Amino acid sequence: MFQIRNYATKYAQSRALRKYPVGGVFHGYEVKRLLPVPELKLTAVDLLHNQTGSQHLHIDRDDNNNVFSIGFKTNPPDSTGVPHILEHTTLCGSHKYPVRDPFFKMLNRSLANFMNAMTGHDYTFYPFATTNETDFANLRDVYLDATLNPLLNQQDFLQEGWRLEHTKVDDPNSDIGFKGVVYNEMKGQVSNANYYFWIKFQESYYPSLNNSGGDPTKMTDLQYEDLISFHRNNYHPSNAKTFTYGNFDLNNTLQRLNKEYQGYGRRGSKKRELLPIQMKEDVSVETEGQVDPMLPPDKQIKTSVTWICGKPEDTYQTFLLKILGNLLLDGHSSPFYQKLIESGLAYDFSVNTGVESQTAANFITIGVQGCDEVDSIYEVINKVWEEVLQNPFEESRIQAIIQQLELSKKDQRADFGLQLLYSVLPGWVNKTDPFDSLLFDETLERFQEDWATKGDNLFKDLIKEFVISKPVFKFTMKGSETFSQKLDAEEQERLERKLKLLDEEDKKVIFERGKQLQELQDLKEDLSCLPSLQISAIPRVSKTYPLLEKDNVLNRITDTNGITYVRGKRLLNHHIPRELYPFLPLYADSLTNLGTSTEEFSTIEEQIKLHTGGVSTRVSVNPDAQTGKPMLLFQVDGWALNSKTDHIFKFWKKLLCETDFHKHKEKLKVLIRSLASSNTASVAETGHAFARNFGAAHLSVTKAINESLNGIEQLQLINKLSQCLDDEALFEKEVVSKLVELQSYINGSSDMKFMITSDSQVQIDAVHQQITGFLSSLPKDSKPCDFYSENYSMLENPGKPTLLQFPFQVHYTAKCYPGVSYTHPDGAKLQILSNMLTHKYLHREIREKGGAYGGGATYSALDGTFSFYSYRDPHALNSLSTFDSVPEFILNKSSWGEPDLNEAKLSVFQQVDSPMSAKNEGTILFHYDVTDEMKQRRREQLLDVNLNDIHQVAEEYLKQDKSIASIVGPEIPNFDALVQTV
């Protein structure tokens, strides 16, 4: 088996070498270099377009999940967000595809498993991934025309960037305010305290980068002419870097690129190198930011210290810096973690902590959040550097890092091509040779040789060169109670300055322009110019991953590259008392953070890294696929080389049975502080998911349990627990005793099931024996309990929308309706309906008109919840009104036809048929009890949905008296009175 696979890999590489000889010219592209990388089973081909100087990197690999990207070096000239707004507006129509928003319209005319456009620090790129060759050609053409020949209409700039517009577009007497998709997106970003700290740090330390995403306080200075100029100066083939990955014929792409580049000449690069501030002495900057409501009032400081450390172009030195960063910061045995976090000086590391190599300079930052003053932090940081120079790193820690690097190389991912693109592009646009980034084995071998001869001096030399006695940059942000009010006041003052400059004619123009934009948004377009796959591209028969079951163990034999993955689960439905449910996530987290009566977790963690790819514990709740009843599961996972799987079970046994909650109370406090410090930021990033989960908890027992485990309720619990850390008696009673009690309920071999994924029957049989030994080491039965998960209470329906307040600048909304189980025939109809509503109605109403960054409908096939949502939304109540209008729109105003239905099916199957890594094959049966027969039946149901079905389920399920609405975000004045009208 291995010999055949290795031969196939070598054959593919030799074929690539023959196909693209160095010096060969293909459609205007000259092959400059080739690089076989056998350890990653790929061959890299470096090509140059002779006419324009455009560079192309092709990764030839036997993988049918093919990737294309076109990217540009886009140094932001200021902080108005012009690279980001241009990224949006290029996708709003082009010369070959002159329709509004071809990007979003291609989302449901394709089977791509990934489509996006992204703005980095100093580059912008447009990637997609698909397994269908026709689809690949379609999307490549749309992307190329969008980037090189966009229409860049002023209306699209106003919609996507920013504009002045009446709050009620059809009322000239209503207030005028700022609107715009990117404007509200970045207001939402600023609401994330971690992002705000990071971007203000960047602006202070690396001001030449500016803010490519856009600072809302500066974005309203951007003019349409600036956008046109930025595109003209940057979106040129000479400044383009294109990338392909996979097994599709490269010649087709080169031919298409060469055709697109005709008429362009070669431009010299005028891009200046962007570097951090040059320091001859220490620099300190202090500013203010958000107060985190989940942290104590006296722990509202974030601070960091930064050193510049050479350039990413030196890829080996950059590799060493990352190893050093890992040794210093990663895990329980790292010195900075022990001295800054474990000591209680701070709650957690700050978001900018670590080695940064994404720009033209490397730098290392040590920072914390959740502290009460900075001097002691700086003192400890300096002391740790001194101690590191005096005390050698343990050999076992180095070997653990090498082991993790080796395993990460062997661990196969379905999105390997995209991950490769993300890893090479930031350096590639900043003069780092992408081939150097691919030399995995060569770099690792050099490191092992250097470590063997130089030992600790390898890292001490780096520290002496870049850190000791070198100028440092200190950045501090203190939480201010008035911060949000100041942001609101700044926006209002900026708006008033704009309004004062308007005369009556200007106001008339604004009013007419707003109406014209809305008319344009409502216009039904002819989309026949856009390419589309046909429904026939979707196979009617689902791909299956054969599994064999023996003794409560599911077995999957597949190509795992010499790795074995083991999963275990125990059904807890009748094992856990109701009052302990909220403590289950903390219990699971504690097992991989505390330690035992005889070992510190730092020692255990090091052994885990030495012998496995990792072990984890978690709790989840899933609905039964047929009945919808909750399945509360405690899960353990682990993976290792085939020869080391016995270690997985040793660690499981140690964590499950020997974790000592009493002895490691202080570590438990550290864990709770860390969880509390990240809670608000997680809501700022995914507030719509929290709103949706909270709403669904009123409709389903499964979702009510999930709200307790993963929702706002869980955040509130962690916040409450973080406030009792200084009261030993209370902490013992409210936290430690409950976790000890959970241990007695969870540990038991009854109701345990497993899944093994490996590459041979011999290995499967060996792991079966290890499972038998593991089960015999556990108590047969855990402590009895008479509470059943089915009896868990749903949240009580409040009868009106609920506002969950957080100190953000925008809102996140959700409206939820009960659906059906996975096997119910109406589930497929509801899933297609949700997709049609997103693309044919809500995208226009919520995003284009309303200015929210995102919005739509979604139907969860597994948990049976239908929901509407909006994301980073400036008009939450308007969005709820739009959700309420959906039934009337479907029944009276929609004019959907078969093409609309087919597009929705294509969009749904993008995820249904998305590529899967070997380790995840068949796991839907293990995690959700969804059989191949159920999957096939649902597939047929999805393909067979008709327009009558859509109207039937809309009328039956989208009833107001069954819905629950929720909003996450800042206070809404007169909320109770206003929601009566929603």
From Swiss-Prot:
Q: Which InterPro entries match?
A: Metalloenz_LuxS/M16, Pept_M16_N, Peptidase_M16_C, Peptidase_M16C_assoc, PreP_C
Locate the residues binding Zn(2+): H84, H88, E185
Q: What is this protein called?
A: Presequence protease, mitochondrial
Q: Name one GO molecular function term.
A: metalloendopeptidase activity
- Entry function: Degrades mitochondrial transit peptides after their cleavage in the intermembrane space or in the matrix, and presequence peptides; clearance of these peptides is required to keep the presequence processing machinery running. Preferentially cleaves the N-terminal side of paired basic amino acid residues. Also degrades other unstructured peptides. May function as an ATP-dependent peptidase as opposed to a metalloendopeptidase.
**EC number in record:** 3.4.24.-
Q: Which GO terms describe its cellular component?
A: mitochondrial intermembrane space; mitochondrial matrix
Quote the catalytic residue positions: E87 (proton acceptor), E160
Q: How is the cofactor bound?
A: Binds 1 zinc ion per subunit.
| A Pfam family | M16C_assoc
- The enzyme's first-digit EC class, named in words, is hydrolase
> Does this UniProt record's set of keywords contain Protease?
yes
One Gene Ontology BP term is: protein processing
Instruction: State if Metal-binding is listed as a keyword.
Output: yes
- Which segment is the transit peptide? 1-7
Where does this polypeptide localize?
A: Mitochondrion intermembrane space; Mitochondrion matrix
SMART domains under this entry?
A: M16C_associated (SM01264)
Q: How does it assemble?
A: Monomer and homodimer; homodimerization is induced by binding of the substrate.
Cofactor requirements of the protein? Zn(2+)
Swiss-Prot/TrEMBL keywords: Hydrolase, Metal-binding, Metalloprotease, Mitochondrion, Protease, Transit peptide, Zinc
Organism in which the protein naturally occurs? Kluyveromyces lactis (strain ATCC 8585 / CBS 2359 / DSM 70799 / NBRC 1267 / NRRL Y-1140 / WM37)
Family membership, please give it: Belongs to the peptidase M16 family. PreP subfamily.
Q: Which Gene3D superfamilies match?
A: Metalloenzyme, LuxS/M16 peptidase-like (3.30.830.10)
